[in-house]
Amino acid sequence: MKKTGVMNSNISRVIADMGHMDWLGVGDAGTPVPAETEKIDLSVRPGLPSFIDVLEEVLKELEVQKIYIAEEIKTENPKQLEAIKKTLPNVEIEFIPHSELKKDLKTSKAFIRTGEETPYSNVILESGVTF
């Protein structure tokens, strides 16, 4: 049995398979996931697990060089935006329209669905390198 880190075997597998500049999505319960993208559904009930809790755990194992966030989060969910910035203080952020973010999920290795139910609580993580 695994003792530390992300316990979900699907998330662990996807993270281990990530290469430089690969994408991994993490987001709220309402995000439409394209059929061609693997969906890892962690939602148990509304709010559980939270977006930030899942993001923090993923970041313990994944090197991230850049993130993509919906432009709309600035006005529709500024509290979540601040939490994301606090969680990823030294990572470049690119704001894109929410419609574009949803389309970009087609090229993500996977999407991790949380129980989060606040608007625009979605991010695409771009994998970096550890050297």
From Swiss-Prot:
Instruction: Supply the alphabetized keyword list.
Output: Carbohydrate metabolism, Cytoplasm, Isomerase
Binding locations of substrate:
28, 98, 120-122
Any one Gene Ontology BP term: D-ribose catabolic process
Q: Which reaction does it catalyse?
A: beta-D-ribopyranose = beta-D-ribofuranose
UniProt keyword Transcription regulation, yes or no: no
Catalytic residues of the enzyme: 20 (proton donor)
**Per its UniProt record, what InterPro entries does this chain match?**
D-ribose_pyranase (IPR023064), RbsD-like_sf (IPR023750), RbsD_FucU (IPR007721)
- Top class in the EC scheme: isomerase
> Which cell locations does it reside in?
Cytoplasm
Gene Ontology MF terms in the entry: D-ribose pyranase activity; intramolecular lyase activity; monosaccharide binding
GO CC term, one of those recorded: cytosol
In the UniProt record, does the keyword Translocase occur?
A: no
The domain of life is: Bacteria
Pathway(s) served: Carbohydrate metabolism; D-ribose degradation; D-ribose 5-phosphate from beta-D-ribopyranose: step 1/2
Q: What is its EC number?
A: 5.4.99.62
- Assembly behavior: Homodecamer.
Q: What is the documented function of this protein? A: Catalyzes the interconversion of beta-pyran and beta-furan forms of D-ribose.
Family per record: Belongs to the RbsD / FucU family. RbsD subfamily.
Give the protein name, as stated in the record: D-ribose pyranase
Source organism of the structure: Lactobacillus gasseri (strain ATCC 33323 / DSM 20243 / BCRC 14619 / CIP 102991 / JCM 1131 / KCTC 3163 / NCIMB 11718 / NCTC 13722 / AM63)
Q: Which gene encodes it?
A: rbsD
